[in-house]
């Protein structure tokens, strides 16, 4: 799974707070044209999950569950009680269904300003790669530049970023990091994440 959009870090931080405050698990949904290819979430107007269906023939919504989950600490005990599926695997769907049965599962639906890219097949991985290439080529901005993210979040300072630039050397990536260091790129909160 790949996620790209404005404010992703804020969404993640808010989700941690939601789970801690409400003691409920949280999943995310993304509108798709072909929900039968995915796990589908149905919810009420308050974001409470009503149902989860895996690749339904007649989906109850167009929102696919995107594979990003937040759980309260009780998930440890929940996971210990999960039985292997018919495929002899412990399934995350079983964990989510356990929280659903207890009415402790909420969903946040990503809006149209956010992109979720499923990369579970060769074709979808190619589509995701082409998407990334197009964005980077058109904007000149890097997607998922770990040094940029670390710098903007305050995990490294300007001196450390400069040390990294010197280590990388004189190339396109190094030039991009110089622009970040010098404040030329000031696009805030556009993050990309692989999950």
Model-based region annotation:
Residues 6, 36-39, 116-120, 153:
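Short, solvent-exposed polar/charged micro-motifs at secondary-structure junctions
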């Amino acid at each position: 799974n790949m996620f790209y959009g404005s404010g992703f870090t804020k969404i993640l931080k808010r989700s941690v707070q939601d789970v801690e405050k409400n003691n409920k698990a949280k999943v995310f949904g993304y509108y798709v044209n072909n929900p039968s290819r995915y796990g589908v979430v149905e919810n009420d107007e308050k974001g409470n999950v009503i149902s989860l269906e895996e690749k339904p023939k007649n989906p109850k919504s167009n929102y696919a569950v995107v594979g990003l989950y937040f759980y309260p600490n009780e998930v440890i005990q929940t996971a210990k009680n999960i039985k292997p599926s018919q495929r002899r695997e412990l399934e995350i769907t079983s964990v989510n269904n356990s929280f659903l049965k207890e009415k402790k599962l909420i969903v946040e639906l990503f809006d149209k300003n956010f992109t979720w890219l499923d990369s579970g097949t060769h074709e979808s991985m190619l589509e995701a790669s082409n998407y990334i290439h197009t964005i980077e080529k058109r904007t000149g901005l890097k997607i998922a530049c770990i040094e940029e993210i670390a710098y903007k979040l305050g995990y490294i300072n300007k001196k450390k970023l400069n040390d990294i630039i010197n280590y990388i050397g004189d190339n396109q990536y190094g030039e991009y990091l110089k622009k970040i260091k010098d404040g030329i790129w000031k696009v805030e909160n556009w993050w990309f994440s692989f999950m």
